[in-house]
Amino acid sequence: MSRQGISLRFPLLLLLLSPSPVLPADPGAPAPVNPCCYYPCQHQGICVRFGLDRYQCDCTRTGYYGPNCTIPEIWTWLRTTLRPSPSFVHFLLTHGRWLWDFVNATFIRDKLMRLVLTVRSNLIPSPPTYNVAHDYISWESFSNVSYYTRILPSVPRDCPTPMGTKGKKQLPDAEFLSRRFLLRRKFIPDPQGTNLMFAFFAQHFTHQFFKTSGKMGPGFTKALGHGVDLGHIYGDNLERQYQLRLFKDGKLKYQMLNGEVYPPSVEEAPVLMHYPRGIPPQSQMAVGQEVFGLLPGLMVYATIWLREHNRVCDLLKAEHPTWGDEQLFQTARLILIGETIKIVIEEYVQQLSGYFLQLKFDPELLFGAQFQYRNRIAMEFNQLYHWHPLMPDSFRVGPQDYSYEQFLFNTSMLVDYGVEALVDAFSRQPAGRIGGGRNIDHHILHVAVDVIKESRELRLQPFNEYRKRFGMKPYTSFQELTGEKEMAAELEELYGDIDALEFYPGLLLEKCHPNSIFGESMIEMGAPFSLKGLLGNPICSPEYWKASTFGGDVGFNLVKTATLKKLVCLNTKTCPYVSFHVPDPHREDRPGVERPPTEL
């Protein structure tokens, strides 16, 4: 039979196969056990329960068939056979700099970037599927944006153990778990050279779409934009936005202190900000995100973006003197969204990845691909992004070290030092390694405790189920996970089975890639969420990605040429050392601040 004949008949043979049978649960299980507690359906097959002890796997469009979606179709088999492992791909991308220097200078870079974007983004379901209240496809899951979506349905409530059927009947105490495995003994710097400028950017950037609703519960969000909408700059609702706006020339309100532009006080912009009692209103700065008064590092970025917005408005006003306040404001917002995405992909994600492949923000790479320009934030992404090991033991500004007690809610540091000095200090101080465990400062360990408790309330499936969902092999032992024996033995004692390990502890305790900030799972799970959210923004669509959207070539070029250095140095009187990477110790250290060039 010819090869063409096989390719034509193979799909027909699949059609003749009977649908997946309704199967009984494991015969050795005590009845009645929900059969879906065993997670029998593989390769993204959907488990549907029938009666008390029967189930059926829906293998539609998974590329697999059979009772548990385990038999590959021929093209699936070829694809999986030829696909390199994630660890091998990571090795290739982080070795052979001379080869990647050549690739980055050729058309191959665009080809690889398109492949990265499509392969990663295809792992995220669109439209969204489940949420905290619905473990099945429903109109509510699709239409109600008050929910976080979720990638995997929750652990069924009637399972024998909290994680399904594996492990112990009671999970280890969250506080004990955090103190034993996550609490810092000694600060472990990130071997990739990540700094506090990166750490504060991560917090500032993600708090526009990670805004869990305290009233509704951990499955709900107040960030209804579900992506890069800059709600942390402009507010997450129209009322807050109006309080922050100047309503003149498209600009935001501001105050002048020591001859510099800073966010207005809550007296001038009466919005809710979370400050401790006793801090007078005139000392509370008003910005889009109500929690940014917590850290001077967050308020540094809030100040920089405020200055950038008003600077862009001046440029647009010069180009379009007939435009009114509203059009100037809205166009400036789109430009800042574009600048944010450009900086995130080409500098922030680049620093995280450690890749020699130079990442590129070019929405046109996806114009020929099937891609949906909308996004929904997943609760797993929210859980994953608690990167508190980045925070140091103390914060060094100039010659002085500030403790957490001195740094948190410090309302005078920003104005006393100025943006340039703080940017320079944060760019020079190393951040901590995220993966590998035992690197969260005791002042913020309670956050990890709360994350673990929240994941139990949300009934997230085990860590290994998420590894399978994102195309990785499940770990077979705790020692394989951690890469060492002592911690592995303790985890075995607490959980009883590697298949019962929880999602967040698994991410933070996984052994890191060599000279990397974290391990395989954080990269393979985090990258799809990030890239889908960034490129799924409407400004990246063919309808929006054109000069007219951004007020002409001047605005479009602001987006296309944005960098972290430009963002800072075009909004300060002097140009500090600014980077997501600590200075190279082999180079002669430059002065703390420089005068910015006229062209950056």
From Swiss-Prot:
Physiological role: Dual cyclooxygenase and peroxidase that plays an important role in the biosynthesis pathway of prostanoids, a class of C20 oxylipins mainly derived from arachidonate ((5Z,8Z,11Z,14Z)-eicosatetraenoate, AA, C20:4(n-6)), with a particular role in the inflammatory response. The cyclooxygenase activity oxygenates AA to the hydroperoxy endoperoxide prostaglandin G2 (PGG2), and the peroxidase activity reduces PGG2 to the hydroxy endoperoxide prostaglandin H2 (PGH2), the precursor of all 2-series prostaglandins and thromboxanes.
| EC assignment | 1.14.99.1
Its subunit composition reads:
Homodimer.
| Primary site of residence | membrane
Q: What is this protein called?
A: Prostaglandin G/H synthase 1
ATP-binding as UniProt keyword: no
Reaction(s) catalysed by this chain's protein: (5Z,8Z,11Z,14Z)-eicosatetraenoate + AH2 + 2 O2 = prostaglandin H2 + A + H2O; (5Z,8Z,11Z,14Z)-eicosatetraenoate + 2 O2 = prostaglandin G2; prostaglandin G2 + AH2 = prostaglandin H2 + A + H2O; (9Z,12Z)-octadecadienoate + AH2 + O2 = (9R)-hydroxy-(10E,12Z)-octadecadienoate + A + H2O
**Record Gene3D superfamilies:** Haem peroxidase domain superfamily, animal type, Laminin
Q: Where is the active site?
A: 207, 385
Its annotated pathway? Answer: Lipid metabolism; prostaglandin biosynthesis
Topology relative to the lipid bilayer, per the entry, is: Peripheral membrane protein
CDD domains according to UniProt? EGF_CA, prostaglandin_endoperoxide_synthase
Gene Ontology biological-process entries: cyclooxygenase pathway; response to oxidative stress
Q: Which residues form the signal peptide?
A: 1-24
What is the top EC class of this enzyme, as a single word?
Answer: oxidoreductase
Query: Which residues are noted as glycosylation sites?
Result: 68, 104, 144, 410
User: Keywords of this protein's UniProt record, alphabetized?
Assistant: Dioxygenase, Disulfide bond, EGF-like domain, Endoplasmic reticulum, Fatty acid biosynthesis, Fatty acid metabolism, Glycoprotein, Heme, Iron, Lipid biosynthesis, Lipid metabolism, Membrane, Metal-binding, Microsome, Oxidoreductase, Peroxidase, Prostaglandin biosynthesis, Prostaglandin metabolism, Signal
Keyword Zinc among UniProt keywords: no
Q: What does the entry's cofactor note say about binding and number?
A: Binds 1 heme b (iron(II)-protoporphyrin IX) group per subunit.
Task: Supply one GO CC term from the record.
Answer: endoplasmic reticulum membrane
Q: Which gene encodes it?
A: PTGS1
Regulation acting on activity, per entry? The cyclooxygenase activity is inhibited by nonsteroidal anti-inflammatory drugs (NSAIDs) including ibuprofen, flurbiprofen, ketoprofen, naproxen, flurbiprofen, anirolac, fenclofenac and diclofenac.
What GO molecular-function term can you cite, just one?
metal ion binding
Q: Name one Pfam family in it.
A: An_peroxidase
Question: Where located?
Answer: Microsome membrane; Endoplasmic reticulum membrane
